[in-house]
A protein has these predicted regions:
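A conserved beta-strand-loop-helix scaffold within acyl/acetyltransferase catalytic domains
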Residues: 49, 53-137, 185
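Context-gated lysine
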Residues: 2, 6-9, 88, 167, ...
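Intrinsically disordered, low-complexity, charge-dense segments enriched in Lys/Arg
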Residues: 2-48, 53-57, 68, 195-276
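Mobile, glycine- and charge-enriched loop segments
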Residues: 81, 85, 103, 113-145, ...
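Acyl-donor binding region in acyl/amide transferases
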Residues: 109-188, 193-204, 209
């Protein structure tokens, strides 16, 4: 599955200008400062070791790629790029930030939690330029090439970083319905109303193949069952909770009840004439 996640926070995008691009051969010239480290922690050899241990680079080699890993470092956003050896075939594009996330959910604020310390995935693309789409693996919205099928391995490693660094959670905003469906759990929307809406969509589109359901949402062919108004996919933050207070909140009866109320209050369907 190709994961296509885009955080919709313009202030957090990589600033204009030439970023620092690093390869193994460049390390001698950049010194040992944090400017040369992905997320301020991983020099390129250490980052390659992380990807090796996660099974990401071995999987690419098995498919005939000789992967090259690069880092681009901006003021707030750090970017990990993996390409084929010729540099022309982009395989992995991961952009991340660390941030303090203001909390708006009343039930979470009532627990005294006003800001979350999170590791955030601003963008992630995993693609296999040499693969082809098939009936069994159809094109998903946002895809140029089929996915690598390495999303879980990479996310597991990133989640481990967030846990090891004492973060409250790992955050992303799923660009498409299929992203949210593939990564829940462990991810859930922090806003109980959003989680309820997502669960209602998942329930009512359960009989539709995920690629078709996601495409239908993008095309405005999913409608509110009561009003027949088109439904848009405009999600907020999904969080994989790590700290005990946030885990307890997402497992609480208050959160579950609010999610259930939002889910049960909504019904969706494909528009008349839309392919099922």
């Amino acid at each position: 599955v190709r994961l296509s996640i885009k955080r919709r926070r313009p202030a957090l995008t990589r600033p204009a200008g030439t970023p620092l691009a690093l390869e193994v051969s460049d390390l001698a010239s950049v010194g040992s400062g944090t400017a040369a480290r992905f997320l301020g922690r991983f020099a390129l050899p250490a980052l390659c070791a992380e990807l090796d241990q996660a099974g990401v680079l071995p999987a690419l080699r098995t498919r005939g790629y000789d992967p090259i890993v690069r880092i681009e470092i901006g003021e707030s956003e750090h970017r990990l790029l993996v390409t084929a050896s010729d540099g022309r075939e982009l395989l992995i594009d991961l952009r991340m930030t660390e941030e303090a996330l203001p909390v708006s959910e009343p039930a979470l604020r009532a627990r005294g939690i006003e800001v979350l310390s999170v590791l955030a995935v601003e963008w992630l693309s995993l693609q296999d330029p040499r693969a082809v789409f098939t009936r069994e693996r159809p094109r998903l919205p946002g895809q140029t090439h089929p996915g690598l099928g390495l999303g879980r391995q990479l996310y597991s490693r990133v989640l481990g970083w967030a846990a090891g660094w004492g973060k409250d959670g790992l955050v992303n905003v799923p660009a498409y319905f299929h992203n949210a469906k593939f990564y829940a759990p462990p991810f859930a929307f922090l806003d109980s109303a959003e989680q309820g809406r997502f669960e209602a969509l998942r329930r009512d589109l359960a009989g539709v193949p995920v690629a078709e359901a996601s495409a239908a949402l993008e095309a405005g062919r999913v409608v509110d069952a009561a009003t027949s108004e088109p439904v848009t996919w405009s999600p907020g933050d999904m969080l994989a909770a790590l700290s005990p207070p946030v885990r307890e909140y997402l497992a609480s009866p208050a959160y579950a009840g609010a999610v259930a109320a939002a889910r049960d209050a909504q019904r969706f369907r494909l528009a008349e004439g839309a392919p099922a």
